Amino acid sequence: MPYEEIDGVPIWHEEHGDPAGPPLVALHGGIVTFHGSFGDVLTWLSDGRRVIGVELQGHGHTPDTGRPMSIERFADDVAELIDRVVGSGPVDVWGFSLGALTATSLALRHPAKVRRLVLAGSNIRPDGYHPEITAPEQDDPRLPNEEEFAAWQADYEAFAPNSADFLPFLERMQPVVHDLAGWTADEIRSISAPTLLVVGDRDFVRLDHAAEMLDLFPDCRLAVLPATRHTEVMQRADQLRVLVGPFLS
């Protein structure tokens, strides 16, 4: 089975594409699975690359063992997985939402492991989100709808070792993202990896915050996808291929 026991958590990972190709670590969004985030882009992304899809603690096939969860722990888990599966690195890292926060932390805590960063639907501070995201109203169009939420729950119940624990896990995950202190301007300026930011124009992330991130990351590009909500960013496969493919190459 494709698990690595890291700090008491069996971390699921799976590989796609060319085993001899340049390695890319793919980090999914919160509550969802690797395929739930990267399924629409995997065909072209794995063409000529070694794609390593990771499922973080409590997500997909990886159990929630009760270990305290944080973005920093997730990043350290990924760093150890890179050492075991790839070697010392560096690797390209593409993270979406929770995965992008994890990728940012990875680049800060383990800079030698990261060659290039793709950060989709990400912020660097809690105030980078529109305020209704962390204090949501039921009818806000930026938020996941009932159909999307039901699909996430169905995936959880299909793959999770703790398949009946979706709602308790949801409660455990809330503070991991919403209570994140974020990073200072100087910390972000210290990231040397070339970075591509991708957000939707109807994302959780405020566009002025995305522009601030563009200014802070030393070697950075920003793409804004039109008519795109947060949950739709990774579904824009053709647009992402045009944006991400050349950047990684």
Task: List each language-model region with its residue ranges.
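Catalytic histidine neighborhood in serine/cysteine hydrolases
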Residues: 214-231
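Active-site loop/oxyanion-hole signature of alpha/beta-hydrolase fold enzymes
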Residues: 39, 43-46, 52-94
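Catalytic histidine-centered segment of alpha/beta-hydrolase-like enzymes
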Residues: 228-237, 241
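Flexible "cap/lid" loop of the alpha/beta hydrolase fold
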Residues: 101-109, 114-152
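Hydrophobic, aromatic-rich cap/lid helix
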Residues: 159-186, 202
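Conserved alpha/beta-hydrolase "acid-adjacent" motif
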Residues: 204-209
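Short beta-strand/loop motif that positions the catalytic acidic residue
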Residues: 191, 197-199
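Conserved HGGG/HGGXW glycine-rich cap/lid loop of the alpha/beta-hydrolase fold
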Residues: 9-63
